[in-house]
């Protein structure tokens, strides 16, 4: 991100790994990794999705109240597992699929962020919803 230096010239600032409360750029964790694995057998499909977001630094000073509530300048990393299963059954004129998905299967809480609205989480990086279960029924003809 360019910034104006004291001498009036612009310089580049590395904002990776930071919350970036003082610029137009949003949080930029150093690492974001997604891994996918599927297994299919006899009309069953099992899937595992792993999502990882690296921790990062919040440069804004924390007040006494924030410190007393346990906030710190390091936003923790976030690792989430999603699991899904589907069964496909062939019918005379089409097929029917039954499915279940568990998003955030281990019910991980989004890391707390001192600077967030209501002292909660970083809305641009983390999903706060916890475990979700999705049932699916689909008929194809």
Region annotations inferred by a language model:
Residues 50-63, 87-141:
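C-terminal beta-signal and adjacent terminal beta-strands/loops
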Residues 1-90, 115:
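C-terminal beta-barrel architecture of Gram-negative outer-membrane proteins
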């Amino acid at each position: 991100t360019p910034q104006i230096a004291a001498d009036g010239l612009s310089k580049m600032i590395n904002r990776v790994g930071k919350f970036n409360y003082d610029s137009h750029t949003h949080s930029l964790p150093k690492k974001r990794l997604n891994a996918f694995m599927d297994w299919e057998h006899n009309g069953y499909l099992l899937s595992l999705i792993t999502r990882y977001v690296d921790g990062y630094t919040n440069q804004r000073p924390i007040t006494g109240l924030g410190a007393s509530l346990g906030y710190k300048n390091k936003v923790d990393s976030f690792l989430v597992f999603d699991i899904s299963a589907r069964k496909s059954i062939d019918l005379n004129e089409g097929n029917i699929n039954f499915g279940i998905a568990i998003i955030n299967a281990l019910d991980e809480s989004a890391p707390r962020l001192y600077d967030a609205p209501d002292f909660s989480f970083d809305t641009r990086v983390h999903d706060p919803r916890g475990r979700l279960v999705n049932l699916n029924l689909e008929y194809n003809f």
